């Protein structure tokens, strides 16, 4: 794990290498007048095309040797590194081949901080690299052959491996031990720009592999942080002298990271998306975790709210949201639409929806999620003008027989 300790030096060397081995670059085509398409994502991209492009970016950009087209609307599934690199990959690609699904969100850096493939050369994260995908390029080539749109998921601030290796980047108890939540998970601090750089370098490598979108997850402080803020020890870094209260400082740090990541990835011609708690859209900003829905949305191409019915209290007046997937998603979509409509250039909305059971909610039999429950969520989104969605199942076991066809 000592590779973490010397990673800033490695970063400098790596940047020198980048300068000498960067893949071919191409001159941008003459700017054409953008044509608005049918989908919200294409409309968003057309608006971006009208913005002034810095000269350096207009002339040079990364060119991948893989070719993926953005689908009519992303309808995707979550895929672990193990699934992508194992026998389950074929099952999941067949699911997409045989339905209206068209995309995969694949773990590149997972929840505990492990990177899901071994890099070809020594990199700052080599010490936490696992061989789940022996050849990620081969995985992407298979997706290219099948026309499946690839998204790289990178878990950012929940990172037990980095927190334990570098307590100075984390939150510690009074005895100096790294803090962990009830599940034994530790976080690194959004205030630390070294953490930003570490994660964005992983994102850049994913883009170089051929992923067309980088999805950042756990872009936040630990849940309930406002209750332990005074108890934990951590370095505010450059935010120590910012004239804001602690809640606003957390919001600024999280938002600044998203803005930084977006700018750093411009060269790679990838979309940037962020996963965010659904309830963040219902309040101005979350006091503990530092998420401001509007501010994050202003800095991404795609916003993916996690709106699993099982994760809601009776917020919308629905006593048991887990058993009312249509009502829950319908009510949420109305709220989110209002928030996004207030932005000058709103991102594409692509929520995460539920394809799993929630036994922790029940003392007796668990409410089952099947075809009707999954289709109900999609119907609610479509009826509110939201064409894109992602299915979450932690073990990648998705309901068979679902009709994913969009509403006319």
What are these regions (language model features)?
Residues 19-32:
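Sec-dependent signal peptide cleavage junction
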Residues 33, 300-314, 325-330, 335-408:
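Substrate-binding cleft of secreted/luminal carbohydrate-active enzymes
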Residues 78, 151-159, 215-218, 248-288, ...:
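Aromatic-lined carbohydrate-recognition surfaces of secreted/lumenal glycan-active proteins
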Residues 117-127, 159-181, 219-241, 291, ...:
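Aromatic- and acidic-residue-enriched segments that line the glycan-binding/catalytic groove
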Residues 88-114, 208-216, 302-304, 381-389:
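Catalytic domains of carbohydrate-active enzymes, especially glycoside hydrolases
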Residues 103-105, 135-180, 213-218:
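Glycine-rich, aromatic-flanked loop segments that form ligand/cofactor-binding clefts
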Residues 63-84, 157-208, 375:
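Active-site-adjacent "subsite" loops/lids of carbohydrate-active enzymes
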Residues 99-133, 226-234, 405:
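Aromatic-lined carbohydrate-binding/catalytic grooves of carbohydrate-active enzymes
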């Amino acid at each position: 794990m000592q590779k973490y300790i010397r990673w800033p030096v490695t970063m400098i060397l790596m940047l020198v290498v980048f300068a000498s081995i960067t893949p071919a670059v191409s001159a941008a085509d003459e700017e054409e007048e953008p044509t608005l398409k049918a989908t919200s994502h294409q409309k968003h991209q057309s608006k971006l095309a009208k913005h002034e492009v810095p000269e350096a970016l207009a002339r040079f950009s990364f060119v991948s040797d893989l070719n993926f087209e953005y689908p009519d609307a992303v309808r995707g599934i979550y895929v672990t590194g193990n699934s992508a690199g194992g026998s389950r990959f074929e099952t999941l690609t067949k699911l997409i081949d045989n339905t209206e699904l068209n995309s995969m969100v694949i773990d590149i850096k997972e929840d505990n901080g492990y990177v899901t493939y071994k890099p070809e050369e020594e990199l700052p994260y080599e010490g936490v690299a696992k061989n789940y995908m022996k050849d990620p390029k081969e995985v992407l080539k298979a997706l290219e052959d099948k026309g499946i749109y690839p998204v790289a998921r990178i878990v950012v601030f929940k990172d037990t491996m980095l927190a334990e290796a570098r307590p100075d980047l984390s939150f510690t108890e009074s005895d100096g031990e790294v803090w962990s939540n009830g599940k034994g998970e530790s976080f690194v601090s959004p205030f630390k720009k070294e953490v930003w750089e570490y994660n964005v370098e992983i994102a850049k490598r994913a883009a170089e592999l051929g992923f067309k979108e980088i999805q950042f997850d756990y872009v936040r402080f630990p849940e309930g942080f406002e209750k332990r803020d005074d108890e934990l020890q951590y370095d505010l870094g450059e935010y120590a002298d910012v004239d804001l209260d602690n809640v606003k400082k957390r919001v600024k740090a999280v938002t600044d990271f998203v803005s930084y990541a977006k700018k750093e990835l411009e060269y790679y011609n990838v979309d940037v998306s962020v996963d965010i708690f659904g309830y963040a859209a219902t309040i101005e900003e979350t006091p503990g975790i530092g998420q401001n829905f509007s501010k994050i949305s202003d800095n991404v191409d795609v916003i993916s709210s996690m709106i699993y019915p099982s994760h809601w209290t009776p917020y919308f007046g629905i006593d048991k949201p887990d058993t009312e997937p249509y009502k829950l998603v319908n009510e949420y979509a109305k709220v989110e639409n209002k928030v996004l409509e207030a932005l000058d250039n709103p991102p594409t909305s692509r929520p995460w929806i539920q394809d799993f059971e929630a036994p922790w909610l029940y003392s007796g039999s668990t409410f089952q999620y099947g075809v009707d429950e999954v289709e109900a969520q999609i119907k609610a989104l479509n009826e509110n003008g939201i064409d894109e969605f992602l299915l979450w199942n932690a073990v990648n076991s998705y309901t068979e027989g679902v009709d994913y066809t969009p509403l006319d």
